[in-house]
Amino acid sequence: MTCAPIRSVVVVGGGTAGWMSAAAIARVLGARCSIRLVESDEIGTIGVGEATIPQIRQFNQSLGFDEDDFVRKTQATFKLGIQFVDWGRLGDAYMHSFGFLGRERGLLPFHQYWLKAMLAGSGGDLGDYALNVVAALQGKFMRPAALGPDSPLSSIAYAYQLDAGLYARFLRAFAEKLGVRRTEGKVRDTVLRAEDGFIEAIVLESGERIAGELFIDCSGFRGLLIEQALHAGYEDWSHWLPCDRAVAVPCASSGPLTPYTRSTARGAGWQWRIPLQHRIGNGYVYSSHHISDDEAAATLLGHLDGEPLAEPRVLKFVTGRRRKIWDRNCVAVGLSSGFMEPLESTSIHLIQSTITRLLSFFPDTGFDPVLIERFNQKAEFECLSLIHI
């Protein structure tokens, strides 16, 4: 049976997740579908996921963004990798860089030749064979140059360190030009269809009723639609990842910007450092069973590059994921779908991958259950692969 195409999409929640969703759907579907985003300025966004991985460039390019304009308006810096400090033992540091390592020779991967050289006493540090590592540690960056396939400068892999709030604003301006309609308000109730439990509409505190065919839940940890209305369920992964809180604070820059994010091991977790053009983003992810909020804040404040620009803010979370990212006619994107501590800078990437998957599996009004099940299987596999990196 042929079902009618989706003609109306309602996005609940703004921030990075909401506006990435609205912008991408509007870009792909255009005038074929009306898109309405509901958010409230009274509800703050988390906005600590400021580090990205190279796939974000594909997302921006697919929307047609000019990179210079994007960097300028989001106060972004370029990122060649992540430096891990004190993880093996105090004083240790290594750079997990993007891009290639060495050059393939014959049938064997490069690291096999390096291992042979190490056994012979002449291999040297593995990072010396990675362009991104060498450049990052010297504070250097350049965009890929058209120098031919044999030049390592022709395929430089990089990402961004950005202000998530400014990125959401940038996306909003783009989405609204494409016809996305923003409504200010808080959701008071969710109306479900009696016959199948699908979401029929949301009701705002003002009394306005907003109907839709497909709903995107970007409401954050509370999962306003996916959990509070549809009860999709949540898998708690605290037994694998015991960190359950983060304290975040921005500080002033005190030196040259570094083209990498830093992750430093601490007694009860780890600390991030993300350099932006106008400030440095800092946070301490920790287990509340091993350290108090005040102790965590004191530790963070004692390891800043410059003067703090705000009071430390504590965020509470339960590591895990929704049992169903897509349930009936609702898809959870961002924190409403789950949370994993951003050790590998994957928070914004998971938003991107969920949106990309949704567009690949975009339904009609029949909402084929086989399609939804396959979507959820892929989402589960992705999350499990990330925690086992």
Placement of each model-derived feature along the sequence:
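N-terminal Rossmann-like FAD-binding beta1-loop-alpha1 element of flavoenzymes
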Residues: R7-C33
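Glycine-rich FAD pyrophosphate-binding loop
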Residues: A26-V48
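Dinucleotide-binding Rossmann-like beta1-alpha1 core, especially the glycine-rich loop
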Residues: G44-A136
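Low-complexity, highly charged intrinsically disordered N-terminal segments
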Residues: A93-F170, F174-L178, T183, C218, ...
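Predominantly flavin-linked oxidoreductase catalytic cores and closely associated redox partners
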Residues: P149-A296, I355
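Conserved FAD/dinucleotide-binding core of flavoprotein oxidoreductases
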Residues: R266-V318, S336-Q352, F361-D368
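Conserved small/polar residues in nucleotide/adenosyl-binding loops
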Residues: I387-I389
